[in-house]
């Protein structure tokens, strides 16, 4: 390794990690005229929501659906970029006893009415949630639901809601978080798929950053967040075989609170904060099945959530809206399963097989029809979500010019890439306040 070189430029902010949260923060900051450097140790942007090629198919690593009409779109528009997605209609349907149910025709009452006599009581609780009337944060979604019904199909459906949005089981997700999302958040009503793979969205954000004076460095491994007199002074990183010091007035980390604490040095953070890092965060896992068929399995352009499965939670056919993601004559699918448990250790092999069995149950002849492209288990240091909703940490750290972004510091009840966009903008605003003070 060559001798360390100091970068003379002093950035307003250096942002570690070009996943959804880091990109959102960098994009908003550059739109406000701040000098920003976004760095990532991978060879492309997108983090756990990027895309790659397998045998001519464009396959997504994690997230596939990009939400429209809220913060995510606002951030991209701020740097002159449009959200390049195609919106399916209907966006979301449910597979109940082998039949497709479209909830847009009647909402929760319509969806649950054919399953349980308690449908109106459950629906009333969603109305209460919109008014801010929520259960205690210690009761799980499963326990809360048992207060209204024991119907297995209803419980499977709610479990699969939890799995699809938060990569958690109903006995792991607080009911307060569940109802906050469906009662007060966007609840994923409008979304679309990018015809270039989800990577295309992140590449557009990176282009917007560069067009507005920001910089994006890939294959750059941050080794250390540097401190002086209790404040961040920048980062030390390795790029192209050289150790480089980046000076910055602020540091934002999308690496998750655990890795961030290691980069800054746990001895520089107080005991209370480190207790949260070690004991509050609860990473959530899922299993992603990418496969293709030459015969369409189901004629639905959006996402299908299942009501009769134990592990498989939802599925989407990407070629219904974006045929260019697959070679001619092929239909490309992604299905998601969530292990039991999701927030603690599990046996990968048996959980993968359980998800496949659910696919076989829902689609007759699945093994003969489907070409499995890959199966990816998102867990550990590369999880589906860095913390299950209800167990997030704050964006602030004990160091006044160091912040966390991403899905370990979401707003209560939120989930997915949209949650990262919301947090990214919020952190960017705090950085701006700090810089302008």
Where are these regions (language model features)?
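Rossmann-like flavin
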Residues: 111-181, 188-192
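Mid-domain catalytic core of redox enzymes
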Residues: 223-331, 342-343
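Helical element adjacent to the flavin cofactor pocket in flavoenzyme catalytic cores
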Residues: 181-242
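Glycine-rich FAD pyrophosphate-binding loop
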Residues: 30-54
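Conserved flavin/dinucleotide-binding core of flavoenzymes
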Residues: 2, 6, 318, 323-437
């Amino acid at each position: 390794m060559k001798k360390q070189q100091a970068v003379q430029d002093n950035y307003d902010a250096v942002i570690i990690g070009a996943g959804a949260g880091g990109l959102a923060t960098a994009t908003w900051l550059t739109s406000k005229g701040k000098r920003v450097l976004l760095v990532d140790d991978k060879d492309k942007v997108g983090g756990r929501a990027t895309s790659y090629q397998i045998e001519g198919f464009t396959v997504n690593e994690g997230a596939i659906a990009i939400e429209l009409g809220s913060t995510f779109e606002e951030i991209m528009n701020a740097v002159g970029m449009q959200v390049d997605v195609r919106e399916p209609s209907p966006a979301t349907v449910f597979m109940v006893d082998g039949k497709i149910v479209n909830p847009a025709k009647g909402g929760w009452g319509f969806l649950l009415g054919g399953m349980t006599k308690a449908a109106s009581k459950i629906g009333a609780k969603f109305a209460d949630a919109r008014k801010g009337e929520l259960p205690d944060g210690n009761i799980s979604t499963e326990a809360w639901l048992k207060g209204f019904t024991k119907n297995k199909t209803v419980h499977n459906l709610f479990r699969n809601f939890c799995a699809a949005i938060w990569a958690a089981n109903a006995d792991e997700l607080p009911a307060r978080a569940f109802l906050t999302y469906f009662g007060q958040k966007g609840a994923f009503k409008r979304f679309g798929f990018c015809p270039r793979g989800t990577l295309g969205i992140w590449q557009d954000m990176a282009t917007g950053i560069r067009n507005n004076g920001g910089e994006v460095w890939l294959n750059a491994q941050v080794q250390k967040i540097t401190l002086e007199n209790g404040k961040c002074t920048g980062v030390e990183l390795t790029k192209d075989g050289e150790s480089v010091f980046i000076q910055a007035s602020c540091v934002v980390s999308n690496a998750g609170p655990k890795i961030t604490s290691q980069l800054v040095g746990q001895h520089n953070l107080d005991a209370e904060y480190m207790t949260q890092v070690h004991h509050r965060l609860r990473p959530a896992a899922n299993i992603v099945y990418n496969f293709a068929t030459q015969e369409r399995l189901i004629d639905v352009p959006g996402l299908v959530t299942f009501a009769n499965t134990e592990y498989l939670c939802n599925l989407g056919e990407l070629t219904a809206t974006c045929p260019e993601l697959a070679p001619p004559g092929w239909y490309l699918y992604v299905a998601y399963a969530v292990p039991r448990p999701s927030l603690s250790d599990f046996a990968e092999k048996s959980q993968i097989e359980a998800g496949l069995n659910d696919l076989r149950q829902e689609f007759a002849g699945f093994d003969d029809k489907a070409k499995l492209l890959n199966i990816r288990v998102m867990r550990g240091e590369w999880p589906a979500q860095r913390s299950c909703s209800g167990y997030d940490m704050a964006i602030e750290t004990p160091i006044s010019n160091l912040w966390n972004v991403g899905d370990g510091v979401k707003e209560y009840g939120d989930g997915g890439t949209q949650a990262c966009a919301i947090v990214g903008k919020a952190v960017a605003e705090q950085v701006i306040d700090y810089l302008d003070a």
